[in-house]
């Protein structure tokens, strides 16, 4: 279930630059072309000292062990505890129990999800939903993509109605169609006052990031519906060599 728990800087999205404890869960039903998480072969790693990047492997990782690990990694500047992945909502029952304990202890809770499981959503203080585009997959049927996209919007709407601080993120590639992102912006504006983070893909192999001009054009197109609720973020942690 748990791949690793560590303390680092949020490297992307609306809260980029804030200090977080990340609880990373293994497994995801999607297979995005730019993702390397599922290639990692380790489990139950816990950082020894906050920000050190040095880990120990635990024999077991029950809920009590997870809470203890979070408490040990807490720093005075901590902003929130992030449930990330993979896709954390594969383990929604366990996460709900962990989140309730953390709330009682005064932590903020943060969800990072692809939004494919709207029926598993419950309240988080903050949530980031990663909206997928067709080019994020080597191949996906039109009907499967439409189902995924509708579920992402349902998830966002549910979190918005729960009064979570919800924002959306979309990874932009060289081949991304501006009109596709503009549709996302319109659909978000129909839900409510939601920030959209435009994130150029981190290039590797055959995957290329978009031009500066395309990024400006996408932001302007989204601004027609979202006004100034559009922002550009990069994977800062990768540029800084952080976890």
Curated annotation (Swiss-Prot):
Chain sites annotated for binding [4Fe-4S] cluster:
28, 32, 35
The protein's organism comes out as: Methanocaldococcus jannaschii (strain ATCC 43067 / DSM 2661 / JAL-1 / JCM 10045 / NBRC 100440)
State the oligomer form and interacting partners.
Answer: Homodimer.
- InterPro entries in the record: 7-CO-7-deazaguanine_synth-like, Aldolase_TIM, rSAM
Q: Which residue windows are transmembrane per the record?
A: none
State which pathway it belongs to: Purine metabolism; 7-cyano-7-deazaguanine biosynthesis
Binding-site residues for S-adenosyl-L-methionine, renumbered to this chain: 86
Q: Where is the Radical SAM core domain?
A: 15-243
HAMAP family the UniProt entry points to:
QueE (MF_00917)
Q: What gene, per UniProt, encodes this protein?
A: queE
Give the EC number(s) under which this enzyme is classified: 4.3.99.3
Q: Which Gene3D superfamilies match?
A: Aldolase class I
Which cofactor is recorded for it? [4Fe-4S] cluster; S-adenosyl-L-methionine; Mg(2+)
Functional summary from the UniProt entry: Catalyzes the complex heterocyclic radical-mediated conversion of 6-carboxy-5,6,7,8-tetrahydropterin (CPH4) to 7-carboxy-7-deazaguanine (CDG), a step common to the biosynthetic pathways of all 7-deazapurine-containing compounds.
**Name of the protein:** 7-carboxy-7-deazaguanine synthase
Q: Which family does it belong to?
A: Belongs to the radical SAM superfamily. 7-carboxy-7-deazaguanine synthase family.
The record, for Pfam families, names: Fer4_12, Radical_SAM
Binding of substrate occurs at: 9-11, 24, 84
Give GO terms: molecular function aspect only. Answer: 4 iron, 4 sulfur cluster binding; carbon-nitrogen lyase activity; magnesium ion binding; S-adenosyl-L-methionine binding
Record's keyword terms, sorted? 4Fe-4S, Iron, Iron-sulfur, Lyase, Magnesium, Metal-binding, S-adenosyl-L-methionine
């Amino acid at each position: 279930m748990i791949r690793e728990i560590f303390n680092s800087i949020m490297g992307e999205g609306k809260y980029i630059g804030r200090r977080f404890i990340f609880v990373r869960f293994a497994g995801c039903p999607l297979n995005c072309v730019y993702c390397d998480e599922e290639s990692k072969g380790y489990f139950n790693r816990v950082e020894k000292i906050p920000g050190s990047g040095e880990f120990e492997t635990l024999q077991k990782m029950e809920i009590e062990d997870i809470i203890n690990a979070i408490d040990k990694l807490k720093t005075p500047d901590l902003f929130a505890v992030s449930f990330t992945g993979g896709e954390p909502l594969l383990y929604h029952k366990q996460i709900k129990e962990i989140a309730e304990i953390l709330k009682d202890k005064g932590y903020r809770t943060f969800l990072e999800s692809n939004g494919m499981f709207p029926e598993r959503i419950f309240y988080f203080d903050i949530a980031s939903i990663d909206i997928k585009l067709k080019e994020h997959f080597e191949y996906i049927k039109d009907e499967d993509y439409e189902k995924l996209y509708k579920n992402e919007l349902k998830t966002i709407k549910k979190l918005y109605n729960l009064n979570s601080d919800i924002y959306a993120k979309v990874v932009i590639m060289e081949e991304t169609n501006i009109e596709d992102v503009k549709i996302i912006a319109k659909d978000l504006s129909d839900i409510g006052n939601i920030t959209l983070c435009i994130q150029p893909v981190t290039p590797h192999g055959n995957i290329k990031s978009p031009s500066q001009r395309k990024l400006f054009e996408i932001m302007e197109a989204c601004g027609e519906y979202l006004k100034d609720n559009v922002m550009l973020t990069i994977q800062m942690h990768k540029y800084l060599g952080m976890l």
